[in-house]
Design a protein with these regions (language model features):
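RNA/tRNA-interacting regions in translation and RNA-turnover enzymes
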Residues: 1-222
């Protein structure tokens, strides 16, 4: 049970700088990661996820209570997560109240996914939901960043508490192609009027997410 008032300095600065309210431990980390990486995540209290969790795109006609305590009527084709055939998450927009995290949540299921913009477009407007996740998914999120985001989530949690058990399930359907370009450090120095050696150049670009292989660099998809 984490006290949402006690975080590391970088998290505290995030809430202070953006003038945001704290919710609970896992939700706060999820919100921070969306800000830091641009990739929304969603946290389920795993003790409330009992049964078959399935993602589907289907015509729905049912009432859905969001984690914002708002009931909406799903009346058209939606991308949803179902638990035992009941909608628990309007994918890419908002999660459901029945599986949401609280200050008492000790075990969490983290969803880090890619949704095509056309599948999310207009949903928050139709259902009158102010959603940071839908705002990002509508504008495209890099499908290659999931591993990095999950590792970062784990790191932030471990900065604040001990982790007992971790398991990762991954399904890759779509990724952006990684492009490589040739780089000549001497030519870069000549053009820029700099004096950067190859070790410095490699160090700088690696920190920015580039992969270096001799005189080739791989451009990060983000």
């Amino acid at each position: 049970d984490k006290n949402p008032n006690k975080y590391k300095e970088y998290l505290e600065n995030y809430f202070k700088d953006l003038n945001l309210n704290k919710n609970n431990f896992f939700t706060d980390i999820s919100n921070y990661l969306s800000y830091e990486t641009g990739q929304p995540t969603h946290c389920y209290d795993s003790t409330k996820v009992n049964g078959n969790l399935v993602f589907n795109e289907l015509d729905t006609n049912e009432e859905f209570e969001t984690l914002l305590d708002k009931k909406i009527n799903l009346t058209e084709k939606n991308s949803v997560f179902l638990l035992n055939n009941e909608v628990i998450n309007l994918a890419g927009v908002v999660g459901g109240k029945n599986t949401s995290c609280s200050s008492k949540t000790m075990s969490v299921l983290v969803e880090c996914a890619f949704f095509k913009p056309e599948a999310i477009m207009g949903k928050s407007l139709k259902y009158d939901i102010q959603s940071e996740a839908s705002h990002k998914f509508e504008r495209y999120v890099d499908p290659n960043c999931h591993d990095m985001v999950i590792r970062r989530f784990i790191k932030i949690v471990s900065d604040h508490t001990n982790i007992k058990n971790i398991s990762v399930c991954s399904h890759v359907f779509e990724q952006n192609e990684i492009h490589e370009i040739p780089v000549n450090v001497d030519k870069i120095n000549k053009i820029l009027g700099t004096n950067i050696n190859k070790d410095q150049y490699s160090n700088y670009l690696t920190k920015l997410g580039f992969d270096i292989s001799k005189d080739q660099i791989s451009i990060p998809t983000f």
